[in-house]
Design a protein with these regions (language model features):
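Conserved "right-hand" nucleotidyltransferase catalytic core of DNA-directed polymerases
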Residues: 1-15, 26, 116, 130-366, ...
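Active-site-proximal helix-loop-helix substrate-binding element of RNase H-like nuclease domains
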Residues: 26-36, 40-49, 56-57, 61-179, ...
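Active-site palm subdomain of RNA-directed nucleic acid polymerases
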Residues: 177-189, 589-612
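Short beta-strand
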Residues: 235-237, 603-608, 717-719, 736-737
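Conserved catalytic core of nucleic-acid polymerases
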Residues: 252-255, 315, 421-600, 646-648, ...
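A common structural junction motif
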Residues: 466, 629-638
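Short beta-strand-to-loop capping motifs
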Residues: 614-618
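N-terminal structured subdomain of primase-like DNA metabolism proteins
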Residues: 676-788
Length: 788
């Protein structure tokens, strides 16, 4: 039997900013009520003071299904069990409707999910506003006037109606024929994912607090210098339009301030004002440092562990995402800064950081030091090497490349590195004659051309300083393709099999043995690609449509995509299918490794892309033993050559113990002196003084369209054209347009500015809305290692 349930709560803590685990354990968090239904029975309600329902008194008789089980599990464990005497529910007796939907590539949000499944459940906008008012009750100190009991009773009635509807919607979506139960291997992964998220990983609180302090000082100093340099026109590093206008007024034509555009402009020897403006922008815009505040908020006050950091199936195809603390965005230490700089940052020794370059840039490179082991333990981090290059060669039987990986793994000889082997095949040279720049050529070609990409993919992968013409890049792409005939054929086989499956409705075996089996099938609605592991990737609403690029080309495959919380048509070509299959296989290798580590009694506390992190007592196991467990191939991948690397220590950060700082650009030294004037405590200019909390009118008047845009605060699912379903009237189609500084519904006519939305829709008080806008840290492109 199955129990479907939904809990409605209240707290002074923000669920979005602190996460379910911190939220549930906070003493101000409580329960209004919860609703539940057994199988197809009528929905019932429990309120504080009621006895424990009989069905909850013996939970092992049921499977408990909630929409987002992380929340219900946390509230049940921290509040229902501890305060109201409910017995614990074993994890084996729980399931998640949202995770099942994500596993089949349907939306996470229950309202949009029901719409995509054709179910007649819609969110009541008035009930949502009631929920927001009741979920963050004002304290007596903050309340400006007495609470109206009649309004509260009306809101509770609306919230109860919403809760009843949510239980019905969860039940209907969970049992939709389009959302089949997970296969046993994936059910095991789901349960392990819950255990790993509940275990969490320890946050390095002193390091995070030091990062936050540095960020505030540096950004305030940079903003002060910008203000002085622009004579008060630019007051913040986040004022992108003003910075571009100032640069373009001096003879340039910048359309963006991304890394590539800034580097290109600086390379053309601009005047000193432009150079300093852009250097200041670079200096202050480091997203990794801005994560310090977020990670501190998600860390448990009792043991400093960050729980609930990952969501299985949160990224395609079936991979994990980190939607709350965003731990997957912590940068690698590519600059190889020494570990001693972590201690320097914690000690506030900014002079030592400055010896190595821009302090914010240095701190960003060290950001993986934000995660650490608990006392007496170490973190052992193992990483599958070049896995997205190995898998295509294995799937397609590109034998020379499979052999190259095996030889490299056997010898460890860097001269035989597969990127060098690729360059040798491209350039038709002996591998021992490949120089370092040519090795980089092989790497760039591998990462850009491996999934059928061309010039555009090369530009995204290659370094900013790459100045090759499109013709040169095309020549390199052709050389890569000529060197990989089997992989090239595999692209076409995948796409052709998908088209045949859609046309005929018959399952198609992409390749016969000894190649790994891949089966593509179409059930009249969804296209599925079953990987060698037995797990399927789903493309809902698949159909063939005319080729949009070549009139005489093969038809495109159109499907519905749930990326970024939306549900909109997307197109797939052979590159898309190949990338999904390769990343899906890589995901399944990682998933199998997680189960092996747990079976060996080695607790996984974090994993990211192709990397696994375990936390063990010091001296309990060697790093090579851990690496050997990672490299054990599952039964379905016995012929896949696997290699990897390992490092260990108290910190997640991989860094040499010591090192010598690089030479500093004289211009950077001059800039340091200018900024240090302000860091040392020089009186800031009046226009740069931080606006005090509560000075609402002055603050709001200072906001431009590029500062704290409303789109960054909207929690409702947004369409590709910036619209959401209006929260003020019942309309299944998105009709409310979100702009940078205001919003307007073209259905009912409701409209307003940022503050209106935050207070009327997001449920914030005026003070909370002002604080959220002031705390906004800017939309900066998050830089990730391209091999990830």
């Amino acid at each position: 039997m199955i129990i479907y349930w939904d809990i409605e709560t209240y707290s002074q803590v923000s669920l979005k900013e602190r996460g379910a685990h911190v939220y549930a354990s906070d003493p101000t968090t409580g329960i209004h009520f919860f609703c539940w239904a057994i199988d197809d029975d009528e929905v019932q309600t429990w309120r504080p003071g009621d006895p424990v329902p009989a069905s909850f008194a013996d939970p092992t008789r049921y499977i408990f299904v909630s929409d987002n089980w992380e929340f219900e599990r946390a509230i049940h464990a921290q509040i229902l069990v501890k305060r109201y005497g409910f017995p614990p529910i074993p994890i084996e007796n729980q399931d998640c409707a949202q995770r099942r939907a994500l596993a089949h590539a349907f939306p996470a949000e229950v309202g949009l999910r029901c719409e995509s499944l054709g179910l007649p459940y819609r969110k009541d906008p008035e009930a949502r506003r009631a929920m927001l008012r009741l979920s963050r009750p004002q304290t007596a100190k903050k309340r400006k006037k007495p609470e109206d009991p009649a309004v509260r009773e009306r809101d509770l009635a609306l919230l109860h109606k919403r809760c009843l509807s949510d239980v019905a919607a969860t039940r209907a979506s969970y049992n939709s024929p389009r959302l089949q139960p997970l296969i046993p291997e994936e059910r095991a992964q789901l349960l392990l994912d819950a255990e790993i998220n509940g275990r969490g990983i320890r946050a390095n609180i002193p390091f995070l607090e030091a990062m936050r302090t540095l960020a505030v000082k540096e950004r305030n100093a940079v903003n002060a210098r910008l203000n002085e340099l622009s004579v008060g026109v630019i007051t913040s590093v986040d004022q992108v339009t003003r910075i571009k206008d100032a640069v373009n007024a001096r003879g340039h034509a910048m359309t963006s301030l991304n890394k590539r555009s800034v580097a290109a402009t600086l390379a053309h020897d601009p005047d000193e004002v432009v150079r300093e403006l852009l250097t200041l922008r670079q200096r202050g815009a480091y997203a990794s440092v801005r994560m310090a505040k977020r990670l501190l908020a998600f860390a448990d006050p009792n043991d400093s562990r960050i729980r609930g950091w990952g969501r299985i199936y949160g990224a395609g195809p079936g991979r994990w995402s980190s939607p709350g603390p965003q731990l997957h965005n912590l940068k690698r230490n590519d600059a190889e800064y020494p570990a001693s700089l972590v201690d320097a940052l914690i000690a506030g020794n900014y002079a030592e950081l400055a010896r190595w370059g821009n302090p914010l840039a240095v701190a960003a490179e060290l950001s993986r030091a934000a995660l650490c082991a608990k006392p007496g333990h170490i973190l052992i981090c193992v990483d599958l090497g070049a896995i997205e290059s190995r898998i295509p060669a294995w799937l397609s039987s590109e034998q020379w490349k499979v052999d190259a990986f095996r030889e490299y793994d056997r010898t460890g000889d860097e001269r035989l590195h597969p990127y060098r082997q690729t360059a040798a095949h491209m350039l038709q040279k002996d591998v021992l004659a490949i120089a370092k720049p040519e090795r980089q050529l092989g790497k760039a070609a591998e990462l850009s051309a491996g999934f059928g990409g061309s010039v555009g993919a090369w530009r995204r992968i290659a370094h900013d300083e790459d100045v090759r013409s499109d013709a040169e890049v095309l020549a390199f792409i052709k050389q890569w393709r000529d060197a990989h005939p089997a992989i090239r054929a595999f692209w076409r086989e995948l796409a052709q099999a998908a088209r045949v499956a859609i046309r005929t409705g018959r399952p198609i075996l992409v390749a016969a043995g000894p190649r790994p089996p891949i089966v593509i099938a179409f059930d009249g609605y969804a296209l599925t690609i079953t990987l060698p592991s037995g797990r399927a990737i789903t493309y809902p609403g698949a159909r063939l449509s005319p080729n949009t690029k070549f009139e005489d080309g093969d038809p495109d495959i159109e499907f519905f995509d749930n990326a970024r919380g939306q549900w909109k048509p997307a197109r797939a070509w052979f590159g898309t299918l190949t990338e999904n299959v390769v990343q899906g296989c890589a995901r399944d290798l990682l998933a199998a490794a997680l189960l092996r580590f747990e079976a060996h009694g080695l607790p996984v506390v974090f994993h990211c892309h192709d990397e696994v992190v375990i936390e063990v007592p010091e001296g309990s196991i060697t790093t090579m033993e851990v690496l050997a467990i990672l490299l054990e191939p599952p039964a379905w991948a016995m012929n896949l050559p696997l290699g990897g690397k390992v490092h260990s220590g108290r910190l997640y950060l991989e860094a040499p113990a010591t090192g010598e700082p690089p030479p500093i650009d004289p211009a950077e030294i001059d800039l340091d002196r200018a900024v240090d004037t302000f860091v040392a405590g020089a009186e800031p200019l009046p226009a740069t003084k931080e606006i005090e909390r509560g000075a609402e009118e002055d603050f709001l008047a200072s906001l431009g369209t590029n500062i704290a845009p409303l789109t960054d605060f909207v929690s409702l699912p947004m369409s590709s054209d910036g619209k959401v379903s209006c929260p003020f009237h019942d309309d299944p189609n998105p009709s409310c347009k979100i702009y940078a500084d205001h919003w307007r519904c073209f259905g009912c006519g409701e409209h307003g500015d940022r503050m209106d939305w935050l207070t009327r829709v997001e449920g914030m008080t005026k003070v909370e809305a002002i604080a959220a806008l002031q705390d906004w840290s800017g939309s900066v492109t998050i830089e990730q290692d391209v091999t990830s």
